[in-house]
Amino acid sequence: MSSVTTPAPVYTWTADEAIKFLKEWNFSLGIILLFITIILQFGYTSRSMFVYVIKMIILWLMWPLTIILTIFNCVYALNNVYLGFSIVFTIVAIIMWIVYFVNSIRLFIRTGSWWSFNPETNNLMCIDMKGRMYVRPIIEDYHTLTVTIIRGHLYMQGIKLGTGYSLSDLPAYVTVAKVSHLLTYKRGFLDKIGDTSGFAVYVKSKVGNYRLPSTQKGSGMDTALLRNNI
């Protein structure tokens, strides 16, 4: 005798159960969304590097979570229309995830900085201070960059980089590394304010797929490729 396979029961979520779920988890979901909103709203490198790193982690997790959800939708599609859209969304998400990694690796090869994997931007400003390369992300490749020294503290575009520097330590050039090319900024103006403070303005002077010679004698490395990044 042939056995008859009993179909698996189909569970449906009623409106009352959905309302009960929201009532039970509403407070926790509200706290989580409030936390994420605060991080995304106030996560800037010029304000708090710690908060900015948390923001980057949240943004970085968005793509794998999106891919997981789209795959889940493919497995448990309601009908063929939903299945088709889910497959398209999954392919798009995976392609964009791969493109992100490819661009990040290319930028990492150019700069040697882990900031290359920043999901927010592919622009990394680089400044060589007495042989030490500082690399930080910026949203845009501005026409001018401002470097400020306040009582020995070094700031670039408002982002604190280090201490123990003077105006005489500022280089003639700074760069902004992108995935496909390098932007060079030449120092166009320098003004001293007091004995230990001042600022310099760097103006975009050259754009191309090239590298600058290192300021470290005998190092054989390029300015945008120094490995002692901070």
UniProtKB/Swiss-Prot annotation:
Its main location: virion. It is found in: Virion membrane; Host Golgi apparatus membrane. It comes from the Viruses. The keyword Ribosomal protein does not apply. Residues 1-24, 77-84 are virion surface. Residues 46-55, 106-228 are intravirion. It is a multi-pass membrane protein. One of its GO terms (molecular function) is structural constituent of virion. InterPro entries: M_CoV (IPR002574), M_HCoV-like (IPR044362). Keywords: Glycoprotein, Host Golgi apparatus, Host membrane, Host-virus interaction, Membrane, Transmembrane, Transmembrane helix, Viral envelope protein, Viral immunoevasion, Viral matrix protein, Virion. The chain crosses the membrane at residues 25-45, 56-76, 85-105. GO terms for cellular component: host cell Golgi membrane; membrane; viral envelope; virion membrane. Homomultimer. Interacts with envelope E protein in the budding compartment of the host cell, which is located between endoplasmic reticulum and the Golgi complex. Forms a complex with HE and S proteins. Interacts with nucleocapsid N protein. This interaction probably participates in RNA packaging into the virus. Component of the viral envelope that plays a central role in virus morphogenesis and assembly via its interactions with other viral proteins. Belongs to the betacoronaviruses M protein family. This is Membrane protein. It comes from Bovine coronavirus (strain F15) (BCoV).
